[in-house]
A protein has these predicted regions:
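C-terminal transmembrane helical hairpin of 12-TM major facilitator-type secondary transporters
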Residues: 298-344
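Helix-to-loop junctions at the C-terminal end of transmembrane segments
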Residues: 61-72, 284-296
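Residue-level signature of mid-helix packing/kink "hotspots" within the transmembrane helices
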Residues: 26, 54-62, 146-147, 277-285, ...
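Extracytoplasmic gate region of multi-pass secondary transporters
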Residues: 28-29, 231-284
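Conserved MFS/SLC helix-loop-helix module at the cytosolic interface between two early adjacent transmembrane helices
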Residues: 59-95
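A late C-terminal transmembrane helix in Major Facilitator Superfamily
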Residues: 355-380
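Cytoplasmic helix-loop-helix junction between adjacent transmembrane helices
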Residues: 103-142
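Helix-loop-helix hairpin linking two adjacent transmembrane segments in secondary transporters
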Residues: 138-188
Length: 380
């Protein structure tokens, strides 16, 4: 019988798995200016890649958020990581631009398979009074993965060539997928454990269950669907979409913004671009403190963070901003938006753990967020 990981080990594995998705996403931020310079892609094709990623990611979140409450988290997370690895590794062979676009869209869909199931798994492993705090700690993996993604891509391009900016993240995702497959065991609602299937799998009652059976097995009821259609949730979808306008486009276009506006070489460019995920990480790290400061009211934390975002956008919208103030404003926006993002996509969904639809709520919130990202990517 396989021994389950301790809660700490389980959290570390979840942290590593989700950080890998940003390692295999933020590599495009550094690679895109080099690919444009080498004539591999045009700026419009890079924009199309961003739009394809966000579209596939948002649609995938809606679908996979629902499936994440039906299927074992280990299966969902492993599949997502291996598809992410496949997309990045194939892009590393520099196929035609149309193929790159499709592969990056697949990468977006694959990465949508992780967060909902991960939150569901953590909600199953940790008690209710710890769920919001654990979720707000897990989301700092976004900042860690973003920083590592930029550093790995920069090192790969500097010491090898641009193709390694995709090959290395792909290999790291393979490693994470293997670790999740063998060690990510989650207690299921009906008492089973989410373990790798062996020779006895055919005898399991759930080996070939229908969707209806899975719905019944997971306890899906009118109460759950009522929770998903509640006015409280519907009202939050609009601000979630607005915060999505800034969230990922900030990372996608930061390198191009500094390169085009201030004509920076790669070494200096990486320094300024790196400030954004570092401040994003800082925002996520201070979130548990901010949540306690606001007596556990995530909406109050979000209102303050959105106010900071608005203040920092004003000088950028006025134009003619020097490089250092622009970097400071963009970094503060990144930190504030990461705080809002933690509220919407991590803490708020855990409030639905009692209804058994954490992953589904994550899917809805992510869909709204990345719908905003798709719209803004097209406009940019």
């Amino acid at each position: 019988m396989q021994k389950s990981l301790s809660k700490r080990q389980f959290f570390i594995l979840s942290y590593f798995a989700y950080a890998c998705t940003y390692i295999a996403r933020l590599n495009l931020t550094i690679a895109s200016p080099v690919m444009q310079e080498q004539g591999i892609l045009t700026s419009s094709q890079v924009g199309a890649m961003g739009g394809a990623f966000f579209l596939c990611y948002s649609v995938g979140q809606l679908l996979n958020g629902f499936l994440g409450d039906l299927y074992p988290p280990r299966r969902m997370v492993t599949t997502g990581l291996l598809l992410t690895a496949l997309g990045n590794i194939l892009i590393g062979f520099l196929p035609p631009a149309g193929v790159v676009l499709i592969l990056w869209g697949i990468n977006g869909f694959a990465q949508s398979m992780l967060w909902g199931p991960l939150l569901r798994a953590l909600a199953a492993r940790f008690p209710g009074n710890k769920q919001a705090e654990i979720a707000s700690c897990l989301v700092s993996s976004v900042g860690v993965g973003s920083v590592l993604g930029i550093l790995i891509a920069t090192a790969a391009i500097s010491f090898q060539d641009v193709r390694f900016a995709f090959l290395l993240p792909g290999l790291i995702a393979v490693l994470a997928g293997g670790a999740v497959f063998f060690f990510f065991h989650v207690p299921c609602p009906c008492g089973r454990t989410d373990r790798p299937s062996g020779s006895h799998s055919a005898s399991r009652p759930g080996a070939h269950r229908s969707i209806r059976a899975r719905l019944s097995d997971a306890g899906f009821s009118r109460r759950r669907f009522s929770a998903l259609c509640s006015p409280r949730l519907m009202i939050l979808l609009l601000p979630a979409m607005f915060h999505g306008v800034l969230k990922d486009n900030l990372n996608l276009w930061a390198a191009s913004y500094f390169a085009d506006t201030y004509s920076l070489p790669l070494a200096e460019l990486s320094f300024y671009v790196l400030a954004i995920p570092i401040l994003t990480l800082l925002g996520r790290l201070v979130y548990p403190f901010l949540l306690r400061l606001c007596n556990g009211r995530e909406h109050t934390v979000s209102i303050h963070a959105l106010s900071v975002t608005a203040l920092c956008l004003i000088p950028l919208c006025l134009g003619d901003v020097a490089m250092l103030p622009a970097a400071v404003c963009l970094s503060l926006i990144a930190a504030a938006i990461s705080v809002v993002n933690t509220s919407f996509l991590s803490v708020f969904p855990t409030r639905y753990a009692g209804c058994g639809c954490v992953s589904s709520v994550v899917g809805l919130m992510y869909f709204a967020t990345y719908l905003g990202a798709v719209i803004s990517s097209i406009l940019y």
